[in-house]
Amino acid sequence: MNKNDLRVIKTKKGIHEALLRLLNKKPLTQIKVTELCKEATINRGTFYFHYEEVGDVFSEFFEEIIQDLKASYDEPYKVLGKDNFSVHRLDPNMVRIFHHIKKYEGFYKIVFSNNVSSNYYYMLFDEIRANLTSDENNHHQIITNNFFYSYQANAIIGMIIEWYRNGFQESAEEMNVYLMEIVKFKV
C-alpha cells in the first residue's frame, strides 16, 4: 500500500489522534499496542502492518510535527529571501510558528502539561534550537552562539507556554504581533 493512499493517511491519522488521547492519560512507556488499537478502533493486524511498536507511532507523529514546525520557521525566509532577511523587515503576518502550534494544539497541550515527563519539552527545545542554529542570519557578535541559541529557543517556548496557560485564547495572529514586538524591543 502506498503511503499517499487515502486509506493509509486516514488510518495513520486515526492512530495518531488515539495516541494523543492516551498520552493525556499516561506516559508513552505505559501505552500498550492493544490499548492503542482499541482507542483507534483498528485491529492489531492493521497496527502491525504500519508499525512495530507504540514508540514508532510517536516517532512518526513527532517527526510530522517537527517537519511542520521547520516549515513554519522557514516561511518568512521564503517571503523575504535568505539574503534580504531582516527582523526589521519582518511583518507579523509572515510569522507562522503560532499557526503551527494551533494546528497541533492537542500535542502541545500534552508537551506543556504537568502530567508528562519533561522529555517532550527537551525534545521540542532541541528542535527549535536546531532551527535557530541552522539559520545563517541568526548569530550574535558578542555572546557565544550556544548561549544565544538556547536563550532564543527558551524565549519562543516561554511564549508558547504562556499561551498554553491562557488556554490558547489569543489568536495565532495576536501571538505573532507579540513575538515581533519582543524581537524588535531594545533594552
Predicted stretch roles:
Residues 1-26:
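Basic, helix-initiating cap at the start of DNA-binding domains
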Residues 17-21, 39, 56-76, 92, ...:
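Alpha-helical structural segments
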Residues 20-28, 104-105, 135-137, 186:
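Basic, amphipathic alpha-helical hairpins
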Residues 25-55:
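Helix-turn-helix
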Residues 74-103:
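Hydrophobic alpha-helical connector segments
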Residues 95-123, 161:
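Amphipathic alpha-helical segments used for helix-helix packing
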Residues 114-139, 143-150:
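Amphipathic alpha-helical packing segments from all-alpha helical-bundle domains
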Residues 135-182:
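Hydrophobic/aromatic-rich alpha-helical bundle segments in the mid-to-C-terminal region
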